[in-house]
């Protein structure tokens, strides 16, 4: 509990992209997926735990409101809350819910303001179900105030944005920091929340988390954490700037948001050998940004303290105790979802300067060390595997999930019928993958039906809960495993775009599925419409060594002689975990630099996750992390809320028929977690104990579920029933996490 002012206080896709993809028999989207450091980040430039400008340990030493040393040129934008605003970019709650995206006057040359509006529109809708039946406008949304009351307003928030690059001196860091400060910021009760981008998204990738802070009159500290949607188009050598507009790499210089490290002479040869390729920030920066996600989140908080005081008119000459907003009197909550949630936890673990007071995250990506001694039990039965790093289990799913989704036991799964109709995929591709796995000795069954059942059981045995079974088809259909495995494989290995890791690359394709020139309109707007982890808007995953020439990976013919969705590429990515070649060793080193310690330094913390999560299975994230934290954090204040009938992609609920009748929005619980941590820090209200929250699906026909009500999404409680309690015990160096059925 924090003393405030001297008093004792009493979420990898976008909806429009997916709709367009299905209409065109293509596949595009991913909403969000899985922080750490290499042991050096916490001391990098002295910035990870407080840089000496504004930390709470100076105790009155004369310190001006000096911009942190790592912050470069700052751009300040002001929004009146009428024509434009912080939360909805002037669209209001109704505009965010509209199926019609904001217009762009010149499609091939959008302005920075147009791109910002389009970015906020797409990123909000990617992580939130914006349908009224799903709860938008009643349970959550810009027009629902901080106390949960439905208002008649449109939820627009006036205020200022401060934007900057942090600079480590290399000119290649490729990270953006942004602070939103509402005009209603409560300087008498100051608060900051972090909203590190989810997935591989750009700076507004966690705008739906920022919404909670803006409603609470808090500042919101964002960072893109070294990821983003705007690519380096190698054919034209053009790159995105900080605001998403594009120019040549030469003109951009060090102001580029991302430019692949390369020599012009080598680029020319590369373009001849592999034309029309694209480099992406997360995959191809060669910096393994994930190892510094905690650092970047902490830097965003430091930047926020300076920006708030600057907005309040404080310049120089004040002591720390005279600054109106300072760590000693400000509640700081590290928050976000998915990869951003993992970054928030990384920041809390690395927070040597006590900048962060509490943590509230949803479905965090948590890569855990293999040395943890944690046993997870469900209903009294021990689970065979838990606590694997993200790249491990995603590369495993990349082999088996496509085949597993063909199992007759999950024939009713959302999107499974699309495979049967060959919508965007080759006919019989699932059966071909099953047969190819058998030919490689990875499945023992001899019939397609038995192979699919065997693959599904392998998924369960490797940590996926049975509650995820009905999600495997949509995960496979939207190529989530190959996209995540390819991007993270490149990033962890610090691979150059020139390396074509596992003979995979990114490009637009023509009608014959071969690499083609990028559409000018799509490229100009990609920073706003993409998700940073191809396949994404107009960009596909390419198998460079397909029979007949480079081709879209899912359409390609590989060494099996069939269209098996490039099993060769999947096997190559998987083998990086155990291989001894240079690329494998680079990836293994990079992965070791991203692992979590489990020590939250006694900070009050809430993790919420859906039991059905098929992207980041609970057995590889929140559950074992709860045990690891109990082992290493002697003053642990962590609680874990596991929500039944909830999964990773709220944005799919109104998009894919069947999701609406099966799943409730996890966003409701992410906001409740923030409410609970804030109440704990502000008023001393205890956090709820770890528990399973049992929700009720909306039911009804797929695509026509009845409207959600509060009864569908009960709150967590301070006194959960014995059959709902999640228990953690540590004995003999082993932590046991017991989860009820």
Swiss-Prot record:
It is found in: Secreted. Its EC number is 3.1.1.22. InterPro entries: OHBut_olig_hydro_put (IPR016582). Residues 45-68 are annotated as: Disordered. Its main location: secreted. Pathway: Lipid metabolism; butanoate metabolism. It catalyses: (3R)-hydroxybutanoate dimer + H2O = 2 (R)-3-hydroxybutanoate + H(+). Pfam families: 3HBOH. One of its GO terms (cellular component) is extracellular space. Transmembrane segments: none annotated. The active site is at 338 (charge relay system). One of its GO terms (biological process) is butyrate metabolic process. Residues 1-23 form the signal peptide. GO terms for molecular function: hydroxybutyrate-dimer hydrolase activity. Keywords: Hydrolase, Secreted, Signal. It is an enzyme of class 3 (hydrolase). Belongs to the D-(-)-3-hydroxybutyrate oligomer hydrolase family. Participates in the degradation of poly-3-hydroxybutyrate (PHB). It works downstream of poly(3-hydroxybutyrate) depolymerase, hydrolyzing D(-)-3-hydroxybutyrate oligomers of various length (3HB-oligomers) into 3HB-monomers. This is D-(-)-3-hydroxybutyrate oligomer hydrolase. It comes from Ralstonia pickettii.
């Amino acid at each position: 509990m924090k003393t405030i002012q001297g008093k004792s206080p009493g979420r990898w896709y976008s909806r429009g992209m997916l709709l367009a993809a299905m209409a065109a028999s293509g596949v595009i989207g991913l909403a969000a997926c899985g922080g750490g450091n290499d042991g050096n980040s916490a001391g990098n430039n002295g910035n990870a735990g407080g840089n000496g400008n504004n930390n709470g340990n100076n105790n009155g030493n004369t310190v001006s409101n000096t911009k942190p040393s790592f912050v470069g040129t700052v751009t300040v934008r002001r929004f009146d809350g009428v024509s434009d605003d912080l939360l909805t970019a002037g669209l209001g709650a109704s505009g965010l819910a509209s199926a019609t995206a904001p217009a762009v006057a010149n499609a091939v040359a959008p302005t920075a303001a147009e791109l910002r509006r389009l970015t906020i529109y797409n990123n909000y809708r990617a992580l939130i179900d914006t349908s009224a039946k799903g709860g938008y406008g009643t349970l959550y949304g810009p027009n629902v105030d901080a106390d949960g009351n439905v208002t008649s307003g449109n939820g627009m928030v006036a205020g200022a944005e401060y934007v900057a690059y942090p600079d480590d001196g290399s000119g290649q860091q490729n990270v953006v920091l942004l602070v939103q400060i509402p005009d209603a910021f409560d300087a008498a009760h100051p608060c900051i929340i972090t909203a590190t981008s989810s997935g591989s998204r750009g700076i507004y990738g966690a705008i739906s988390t920022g919404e909670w802070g803006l409603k609470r009159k808090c500042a919101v500290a964002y960072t893109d954490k070294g990821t983003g949607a705007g690519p380096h188009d190698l054919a034209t050598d053009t790159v995105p700037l900080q605001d998403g507009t594009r120019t040549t790499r030469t003109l951009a210089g060090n102001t580029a948001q991302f430019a692949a490290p390369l020599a012009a002479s080598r680029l020319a040869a590369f373009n001849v050998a592999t034309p029309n390729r694209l480099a992406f920030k997360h995959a191809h920066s060669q910096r393994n940004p994930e190892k510094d996600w905690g650092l970047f989140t902490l830097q965003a908080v430091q930047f926020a303290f300076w920006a708030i005081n600057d907005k309040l008119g404080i310049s120089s000459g004040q002591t720390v105790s005279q600054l109106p907003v300072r760590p000693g009197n400000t509640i700081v909550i590290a928050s976000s979802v998915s990869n951003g949630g993992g970054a928030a936890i990384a920041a809390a673990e690395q927070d040597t300067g006590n900048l962060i007071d509490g943590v509230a995250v949803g479905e965090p990506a948590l890569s855990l060390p293999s040395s943890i001694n944690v046993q997870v039990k469900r209903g009294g039965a021990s689970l065979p595997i838990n606590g694997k790093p993200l790249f491990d289990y995603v590369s495993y799913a990349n082999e088996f999930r496509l085949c597993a989704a063909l199992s007759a036991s999950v024939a009713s799964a959302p999107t499974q019928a699309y495979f049967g109709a060959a919508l965007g995929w080759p006919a019989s591709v699932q059966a071909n993958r099953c047969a190819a796995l058998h030919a490689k000795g990875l499945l023992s069954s001899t019939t397609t039906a038995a192979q699919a059942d065997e693959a599904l059981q392998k998924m369960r045995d490797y940590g996926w809960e049975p509650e995820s079974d009905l999600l495997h088809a949509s995960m496979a259909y939207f190529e989530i495993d190959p996209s995540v495995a390819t991007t993270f494989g490149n990033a962890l290995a610090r691979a150059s775009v020139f390396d074509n890791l596992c003979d995979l690359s990114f490009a637009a394709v023509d009608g014959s599925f071969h690499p083609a020139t990028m559409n000018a309109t799509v490229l100009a707007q990609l920073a706003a419409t993409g998700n940073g982890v191809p396949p994404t808007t107009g960009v596909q995953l390419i198998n460079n060594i397909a029979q007949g020439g480079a081709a879209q990976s899912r359409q390609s013919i590989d060494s099996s002689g069939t269209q098996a969705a490039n099993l060769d590429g999947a096997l190559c990515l998987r083998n990086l975990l155990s291989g001894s070649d240079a690329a494998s060793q680079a990836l293994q080193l990079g992965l070791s630099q991203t692992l979590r310690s489990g020590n939250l330094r006694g900070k009050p913390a809430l993790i919420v996750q859906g039991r059905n999560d098929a992207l980041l299975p609970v057995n590889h994230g929140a559950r074992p992390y709860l045990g690891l934290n109990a082992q290493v954090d002697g003053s642990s204040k962590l609680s874990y809320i596991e929500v039944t009938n909830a999964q990773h992609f709220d944005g799919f609920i109104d998009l894919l028929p069947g999701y609406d009748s099966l799943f409730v929005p996890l966003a409701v619980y992410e906001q409740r977690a923030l409410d609970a941590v804030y109440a704990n820090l502000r008023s001393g209200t205890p956090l709820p104990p770890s528990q399973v929250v049992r929700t009720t699906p909306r039911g009804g026909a797929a695509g026509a579920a009845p409207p959600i009500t509060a009864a569908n999404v009960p709150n967590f409680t301070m006194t959960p029933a014995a059959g709902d309690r999640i228990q953690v015990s540590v004995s003999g160096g082993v932590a046991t996490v017991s989860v009820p059925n």
